[in-house]
């Protein structure tokens, strides 16, 4: 299967790093990058993507809103979140049916590869630090759970 992938992050270094990791992945045909929701919308008029790697903090749109927009246009698309946010209330929001994988930016590059492989098999993936925080969230108290 040849995949089209979109990476959305407002930091060029992160975009380049993720792209260089994905180039090594068999089956990926096309990788496009965007630094904003607007740039992604422009790309989506030219390409259809199977997989999106999304940062939650973008200059022009909330990452959760962007996920909603993508899923409305492409319900079958896979979503991997790449975020620096490890706050409990965000961790809770990330456990959502529309999100297929979560990899913290503090994680090693191997975890984005594991996320990609797992998601393409139709399963969910959460990096080890996410799993740890998610298990601990109930000890800390109630957190918002809506997207």
Feature-to-residue mapping (PLM):
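A short, hydrophobic beta-strand element within the central beta-sheet of small alpha/beta folds
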Residues: 76-86
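Short, flexible helix-to-coil linker/hinge segments that flank and couple to helix-turn-helix
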Residues: 89-95, 99-100, 104-147
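Active-site residues of response regulator receiver
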Residues: 9, 55-56, 83
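Acidic catalytic/metal-coordinating carboxylates
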Residues: 36, 62-65
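Short amphipathic alpha-helix used as the core "switch/output" element in two-component signaling
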Residues: 64-75, 92, 96
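The feature encodes the CheY-like receiver
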Residues: 59
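Short hydrophobic/Thr-rich beta-strand motif most characteristic of the beta2 strand and flanking loop
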Residues: 27-35, 43
């Amino acid at each position: 299967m040849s995949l089209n992938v979109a990476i959305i992050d407002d930091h060029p270094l992160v975009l380049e790093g993720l792209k260089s990791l994905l180039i090594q992945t068999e089956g990926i045909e096309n990788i496009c990058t965007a630094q904003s929701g607007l740039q992604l919308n422009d790309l989506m008029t030219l390409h259809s993507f199977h997989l999106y790697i999304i940062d939650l903090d973008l200059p022009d749109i909330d990452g959760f809103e962007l996920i909603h927009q993508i899923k409305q246009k492409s319900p079958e698309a896979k979503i991997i979140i790449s975020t620096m946010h490890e706050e409990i209330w965000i961790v809770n929001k990330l456990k959502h049916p529309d999100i297929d994988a979560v990899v913290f930016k503090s994680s090693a590059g191997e975890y984005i590869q594991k996320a990609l492989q797992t998601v393409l098999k139709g399963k969910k993936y959460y990096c080890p630090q996410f799993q740890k925080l998610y298990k601990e969230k109930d000890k800390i108290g109630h957190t918002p759970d809506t997207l």
